[in-house]
Amino acid sequence: YICDHMLYFLENHDEQRIASDFFAGNPWKGVPGMIVSVLLQQNPVMVYAGQEFGEKGMDKEGFSGQDGRSTIFDYWTSDTVYKGFFNRDALTTDEKKLSLIYQGLLRFCNREKAVREGLTFDLMYVNHQSHQFNPHKQFVFLRKADDEVLLVVANFDQERVQINVTIPTHAFDFLGIPEQEVEMTDLLSGFTKVVDLKRDGQVALDVEANYGRIYKFNIKK
């Protein structure tokens, strides 16, 4: 499939940086988008020049001036790139924390078989606008390989949310998931919860602002 060979990215040298004053102004607003980009398919993913440290791209670089972008040419060095690779002690606590999240997401690409090789099942078509879910602010899907399943939720909202995610009968049939009680572990936090999986049932989730949950569980056949 062509999607397995498409490079996914949120930032490049042509686009304004997520953290720039011209765009979101906050690198944490890019985290839920990165969760989706990294985990949705088997495709390669790119992290661009200090994105993992929250590079703002607000330097007045050469010919382009202050435009919220970071050049690919070697006449300029972004401050966060220099600190991140040559002087990590100079990184702020926030920059270090953001970097650890990006590192963890990239490790999941290689470590988790459901991400490397697994099937994808979109859950957005059954999770409509309601007091329990906002499709304009949350994005949900499943990944599965063998007996390993990931329930991925990205929250683009600026507030912590309590949501209910519907898993339709079609997902159980397509992925070969039996109805059963499972213990889910969030790969981002280590938090565990027990869920009774039912066709067309709901899973209650608590998700932080500009963040997500990557719940992993194993099924018994």
Please state what every model-predicted region is.
Residues 195-221:
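C-terminal beta-strand-rich structural cap/linker in extracellular carbohydrate-active enzymes
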Residues 142, 185, 216-218:
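Residue-level detector of conserved, well-ordered beta-strand and adjacent loop positions
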Residues 162-166, 183, 194, 204-206:
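Ser/Thr- (and often Asn-) enriched beta-sheet segments in non-cytosolic proteins
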Residues 3-12, 17-181:
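Loop/helix patches that line or flank the sugar-binding groove of alpha-linked glycan CAZymes
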Residues 124-125, 189, 206:
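Compositionally biased amphipathic helical and low-complexity segments enriched in hydrophobic
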Residues 181-201:
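Solvent-exposed beta-strand/loop surfaces of large extracellular or lumenal domains
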